[in-house]
Amino acid sequence: MDVDVEEAALEQVAALLQRPDQLEKLPELKKRADRKKLAVEAMLRTGVQGQLEGIRTAIAHLQTASDDITAISQGVHDIRERLGPFPQLKEKLRELRDANARHGQYAAAMENLKHIFNLQTTLQEIRDALDDEKSGGNLLLAHKHIMDLERARDELLAEVHKMSGTNTEKEQMLLVNFFKGVDSVVAELSKNMWFILGRTLEMVKGNEQGGGPQQVVTCLRIVEREERIDKFYMEARSKNSSAFVPPGRPRNWKEKALRSLEKTVSNRVDGNQLEDRSLNKAWLARYLEVCKNVIMDDLQLAKVAIPCFPPDWQIYDRYVHMYHTSVCRRLREVASEHLEKSELVQLMSWIKFYASEDMLGHPKLRINAQAILQDSPVLSRSTLNQLCDQFVEMSRDDLKLWLKNTVSHETHDWYKNLRPSEDNHGYFYTDLPNTVFGMLKDTVTLAKEVSVEVIPSIINLTIQEFNELAGKYRDAFTAYKTDYFAERSKYQEFTSNIIAIANNLHTCIESTEKYKQQIRLSMEGEQNAAAAMTTPLASGRRTAVRQQQLIENMDALNTKWSNAASVAVNYLREEVITDIAPSLVEIFSKKWLTGSAALETVCMTISDYYHDHKHLRPVTRSTLLMDLQFRIVSEYLKAIETKRVSLNSYEERALAGKRMKADVVRLDNLYAEFATSSDMADQLPLLTSIVAAAGDVISLKDKSLLSLEATSFARKFPNCPAELLSAVIATRDDISGSEARSLASEVLQHVQFHPKDQIFDQLFALRQQENSERLPNLGMANMFKADFMSMLKRDA
């Protein structure tokens, strides 16, 4: 240890004397070290002195403690000696103690002798008071007598309870049997009280004879007294498990009073159903309406009854809770039964109304209806989902039946040769679109009564059923068309009926598009709310559907309507083509070349049919007229390609070119006449220019200019097939087939990058089809949609 101290001292000195100039401070450093040493020594002396003082004090305390222990031991010994005689004293005083107990019992008996001797008289007075209750009420007097008798009985029983002996239980039974009449009048009193409290609202309203609200207050005062007595004995029992508690306690009359009120409320809700489905189809609506009136009236009376009840009862909140609980229980029972569609709608509509400001949320009632329904909804989410699914399935069955009957009725009218109705624009129509989409509107209106969540499912199932309807409708008018072509004279109104069908389908497309726009707008409006929603409202429902899926299904439905409309227009075209087919065969033939009136017959036939076709909607009419124009112009091209006529001289070629141009003028005039109708917003595109251009190529006199004329033809129709152009050129008598093909290929190669008119693509494709094949409808679905959107823009 000395070595460590020495090393530490050397290190300290080395740290202080690191530079030569620090040696000058050596005397000062020595003085500082001496002062520090003296201070440390003084601190050590002080510490040692304090320890010594503490030791002296401890020794003195130990001496004092020893003396105290000796004194206490002596005192305890003296007390033990003095208490020695006490056990013998207890035995000597036993008789005195027993005498004191008997004296207490006798004193209690003497004090209650009046009640004991007058027990039967008092019981009769109580019964008389209870009997008088109907004419004014003496419930307080009856209860006073009962309390007197109970006090006498309980004091005697308490004295017996204090005794410890073999006869204690026997004496208790003797007293209980003696006072058993008290229990009967207590039961009678409580029965009267529960009757009065059960009619609290009628009492408050003043519809009952007697004291009215005063009787209610009397009953509540008695209940409060009994509650205080129960509390006294229960607190005594909680402090001492062997404490005396009178028989029949606690009575819990407050709980029984509330149970009486709850039973009355339950009866008020359940007892309003006076009929069932067998007696009245509207039984549920009538029952719910009565419930609504009863609940509103009773809750307003409950507010009036608040002053009659103690504040801690919170009677108004209890009434609200009891009515809500009873309503929930009853409606759950109704929901579990097999409900018809109208009953289901009435139930769901009433549940929505239940929380509205017209009922539970009425300002006068001052009830937080939303909080109540959040804590205890009328129907569970699973039950609501189940009811919504039931409604969807019921609606599906109804729609199937309605749509089937609608198509059946429509078909029946066709075969009766009834002319369709005309609207204010002169367009034929039937009631099918209004009926069909009226069903959708009515079903959606009902769905709103059920739940907003079920509307997408209803619209979706309606779309599905409309898809089936479109197919069945198409099959029905296809069968009608087959019967017509089998015996045309039998069905005079075929054309007008098919026109009405096409117009109906156009109306269906418009209506579907309107609903689709409404759904799209609702999707945009609800996008933010849907993004913030953690759980979909329709989660757990079997028939739930996304709105985007609705849009896609509606597009598919519109395609189905459009296809059916195309078929209807095709049947109108087929009817015309059947009549003009013999004349079409004569076009660009020897007979035509020599002056046949084939085209004039065609034009007159189309013009004659136009008297019916003008009752078509403009878009559909344009499609039909364009179909017919396709058919006529394609007949020229087909005749040229099949070499229906051989032109052996310039004179014949010139005559053919002249006839072709004359036919073009006739067709153009005919279609110009059609386009002048007030409802034809746009001119009908004409295809006849290709016939005139072909006539120019055929009738050209100077062969040296043929290449130039062919180039001009190719520039006008750059998408013309090489086979068709070579056939036009080869119709001339001064050029061979190989030369025609070579020239056609050459000129078309020069114009391959020129802008092309797509309408001629359809024409060129059509020329290859047989007469019986169906013509394309120019993308009718797209035309209908574009026309509808343009009408919307014009309206805006």
Curated annotation (Swiss-Prot):
> Would you kindly state one Gene Ontology biological process term found in this protein's UniProt entry?
protein transport
Classification via InterPro entries: EXOC3/Sec6 (IPR010326), EXOC3/Sec6_C (IPR042532)
A GO term, aspect molecular function: SNARE binding
Q: Which residues form a coiled coil?
A: 87-174
Segment forming the signal sequence: none
Read off the Gene3D superfamilies from this record: 1.10.357.50, Exocyst complex component Sec6, C-terminal domain
> Which superkingdom, per the lineage?
Eukaryota
Keywords of the record, alphabetical order, are: Coiled coil, Exocytosis, Protein transport, Transport
A Pfam family of the record is: Sec6
GO annotation, cellular component aspect: exocyst
Record bears the keyword Ion transport:
no
Q: How does it assemble?
A: The exocyst complex is composed of sec-3/exoc1, sec-5/exoc2, sec-6/exoc3, sec-8/exoc4, sec-10/exoc5, sec-15/exoc6, exo-70/exoc7 and exo-84/exoc8.
The record's similarity note reads: Belongs to the SEC6 family.
Q: What does this protein do?
A: Component of the exocyst complex involved in the docking of exocytic vesicles with fusion sites on the plasma membrane.
Kindly provide the name given to this protein in its UniProt entry.
Answer: Exocyst complex component 3
What species does this protein belong to?
Caenorhabditis elegans
Source taxonomy: Eukaryota, Metazoa, Ecdysozoa, Nematoda, Chromadorea
Q: Which gene encodes it?
A: sec-6
